[in-house]
Amino acid sequence: MTGFEQEPDAAVALFGDRIELARRFAADLAREGETRGLIGPLELPRLWSRHILNSALVAPVLRVGVVGDVGSGAGLHGLVLAIARPDVRFVLIEPMERRVDWLLEEVQALGLDNVDVLRARAEDVRLATPLDQVTARAVSALSKLIPLTVPLLRSGGELVFMKGERVDAEIEAAAKVIRKAGLVDVRVEVLGEGVLPEVTRVFRATLR
């Protein structure tokens, strides 16, 4: 695992007594992620800071309940959040078979009994009970992501999307979509200031 980033000091603070599970996940991803097409070759030197800890910053935002993660991929951030928040039930939604296989393997290997994995596209998911929150990281622009995820939410449920520096422009471009979807209390929160080198921007909105 040449070039694997050393664990930053912030890791223990973010994961607490779940840090060993986070370390195991990081080691598994560093060992197999590139060969299985889960992460690119340039990600190992920043796997902790850019991906795992960046994802973990969202954990305190989550409510106790059932959270769906759309486009779970390598588990960044769905598995990371499931490690950090054992009191929350997670439904990881991912359409690609090889990624689903990885997610299922890690759920079993890490003993995560608060995770279900669905192989499906978000628009094809039919849940018996609507979700309390839906998360997504690096999936698509808000104008496309909102129509895919709002049908999964209960009334009063919340979208929690990790976004980049252009999130304000995305919100402006998606203004009509946001109104049509019935979203209120739309805001952007900046997380991780003074904790990690790069802050995390989170788009939050509540379904009426």
Language-model segments: what does each one mean?
Residues 12-13, 36-37, 45-46, 74, ...:
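Flexible, active-site-adjacent loop/turn segments at secondary-structure boundaries
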Residues 3, 7, 26, 30-36, ...:
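A generic structural signal for ordered alpha-helices
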Residues 70-72:
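Conserved beta-strand/loop positions that form the S-adenosyl-L-methionine
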Residues 89-208:
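S-adenosylmethionine
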Residues 74-87:
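Conserved SAM-binding loop of SAM-dependent methyltransferases across substrates and taxa
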Residues 1-68, 83-84, 98-115:
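Class I SAM-dependent transferase core
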